[in-house]
Amino acid sequence: MSDKKVIGILGGMGPLATADLFQKITLHTAASCDQDHPRVCIDSNTNISDRTAALLHGGADPVPEMVKSAQRLESIGADLLIMPCNTAHNFYDAVASSVSIPVLHMIAITRDALKSRGVKCAGLLATDGTVQTGIYQRTFEGSGVELLTPDNTEDQSAVMDIIYNGVKAGDLTHDATAFRAACEHLLARGAEVLILGCTELPPAFDIYHLDYPNIDPTLELALAAVRAAGCKTK
């Protein structure tokens, strides 16, 4: 397929989330040979500073390195960009304005997927940076999908713990008991599904054998990118 577009992955936020996105692009492309897959360029830029630390705690600005990666990917031939990091979408405008190619918006794609499935209430599992800045709430405004977030500090701390001390730390045997409770509390309050609103959470669900109804924004982004590249999904 000579008319395929090249997907650029602005990655490193974190590395496992980047690998998870690429795997989902590959697994969900309807392909009978290598040539049916989209061409993908990946910059797993681990020099990008922590997004939550920047947003809430005065940490280093991640935008300069994000922009470098975006422009690097465009310069080597990417026709569209995707960012496997929910919190990074707080800096979406800065990245999108730095390049002349489209940047797909993972949170908007997730919103549209929930609407198409008729979901009326979803529970958001995400970093403090994503929850407190309201990026999901703003994107979902007027969508008809109610968003629930953890309503106590213990549950939100459990989400941060599984992300940072579990997945990011590479602890494959991390205790997920408190995180399970946070998930169950959201479902008990009326959430029909849980939004895995940090790209470390889909791997967490696999690593720690979690089984709750959910929507995976990484998967939704992968599907959208494959279609935008001119390939078929499965």
Regions found by a protein language model. Give the residues of each.
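Non-catalytic structural scaffold of enzyme domains
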Residues: 1-234
